[in-house]
């Protein structure tokens, strides 16, 4: 390996890294290690000591992404991911809320999509009647049917980060967690402007990282939403606004995905499994490796696996 760089960080960032590289994790972990991940031209090894080693041709670029990640001090007592000062009140399920959710972060092909939705408390019975629930429990046909009705019922803001721009931002040192934070904040900001002068009783974000880390990702942004903002994992079960956001995000993602398949001239699979590697290899043969950034998230391990299939 041509390069080796070691950085010192903390358990919060290492947990974010493990989540970021979840599709590239190696089954083998060295003694004293937390995880090892292999991405194109770089192997990342995180240790219990807080040290993280980057080895390979892209070691410097990969390490740079994490040297810019805000670091928070270690907490002596391990807390639940939902144990923080941003936890929603017990009554939130009956409140008028803006909810936001994202899809596409675990898919090799296709964009990242974030949607924020405002649901007035008086609309909750209607949303239940429409069948609004977590989009993971609905197939594409059900998503489409419910989403088409939701579009005329609730105010929303939808943002799509296409693959080329995603890869460009990632190469500039923005990890996926930061990109998600930027999109959530922007979608919420757009929606609040859209529904003004109406003010929601709160904003609920489907939690993908600790709230303090989320806000540190937004440190350089001019507009950051902080007033009555709550975070909860499985937010779609906490308030229907998040479930509605999840459905509209999935609806947008499916539409974008179908367009991408047409552009590729072949069906593209979702997810990040072996069938994705095979499809990516076929796509490279068909259109050339130069066009791959238009279709995929290059930092996924699937990139390297696809090229391996072509050897």
Curated annotation (Swiss-Prot):
GO BP terms: DNA replication, removal of RNA primer; mismatch repair
EC code(s) of this entry: 3.1.26.4
Gene Ontology CC annotations of this record: cytoplasm; ribonuclease H2 complex
GO MF assignments: magnesium ion binding; RNA binding; RNA-DNA hybrid ribonuclease activity
Entry's transmembrane regions: none
Class in the EC hierarchy, top level: hydrolase
Required cofactor(s): Mn(2+); Mg(2+)
Taxonomy, superkingdom: Bacteria
Reaction(s) this enzyme catalyzes, per UniProt: Endonucleolytic cleavage to 5'-phosphomonoester
Bridged cysteine pairs (disulfide): none
Binding of a divalent metal cation, residues: 101-102, 206
Keywords: Cytoplasm, Endonuclease, Hydrolase, Magnesium, Metal-binding, Nuclease
RNase H type-2 domain sequence ranges: 95-311
Pfam families with a match to the protein in the record: DUF3378, RNase_HII
Cofactor info, note text: Manganese or magnesium. Binds 1 divalent metal ion per monomer in the absence of substrate. May bind a second metal ion after substrate binding.
Subcellular location: Cytoplasm
NCBIfam families: rnhC
Role noted for this protein: Endonuclease that specifically degrades the RNA of RNA-DNA hybrids.
Family that this chain belongs to: Belongs to the RNase HII family. RnhC subfamily.
Protein name: Ribonuclease HIII
């Amino acid at each position: 390996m041509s390069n080796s760089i070691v950085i010192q960080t903390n358990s919060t960032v290492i947990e974010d890294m493990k989540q970021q590289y979840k599709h590239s994790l190696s089954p083998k972990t060295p003694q004293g290690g937390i995880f090892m991940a292999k991405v194109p031209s770089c192997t990342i090894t995180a240790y219990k000591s807080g040290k993280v080693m980057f080895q390979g041709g892209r070691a410097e670029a990969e390490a740079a992404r994490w040297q810019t990640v805000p670091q928070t001090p270690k907490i002596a007592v391990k807390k639940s991911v939902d144990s923080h000062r941003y936890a929603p009140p017990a009554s939130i399920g009956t409140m008028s809320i803006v909810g936001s959710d994202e899809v596409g972060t675990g898919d090799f092909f296709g964009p990242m999509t974030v949607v924020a939705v405002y649901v007035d408390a008086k609309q909750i019975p209607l949303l239940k009647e429409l069948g609004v629930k977590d989009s993971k429990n609905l197939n594409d046909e059900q998503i489409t049917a419910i989403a088409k009705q939701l579009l005329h019922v609730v105010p929303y803001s939808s943002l799509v980060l296409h693959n080329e721009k995603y890869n460009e931002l990632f190469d500039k040192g923005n990890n996926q967690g930061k990109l998600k934070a930027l999109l959530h904040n922007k979608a919420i900001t757009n929606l609040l402007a859209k529904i003004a002068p109406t003010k929601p009783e709160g904003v609920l974000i489907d939690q993908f990282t600790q709230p303090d880390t989320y806000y540190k990702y937004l440190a350089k942004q001019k507009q950051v939403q902080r007033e009555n903002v709550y975070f909860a994992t499985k937010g779609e079960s906490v308030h229907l606004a998040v479930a509605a956001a999840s459905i509209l995000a999935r609806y947008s993602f499916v539409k974008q995905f179908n367009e991408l398949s047409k552009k590729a001239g072949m069906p593209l699979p979702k997810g990040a499994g072996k069938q994705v590697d095979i499809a990516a290899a076929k796509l490279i043969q068909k259109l050339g490796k130069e066009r791959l950034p238009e279709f995929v998230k290059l930092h996924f391990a699937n990139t390297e696996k696809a090229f391996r299939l072509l050897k």
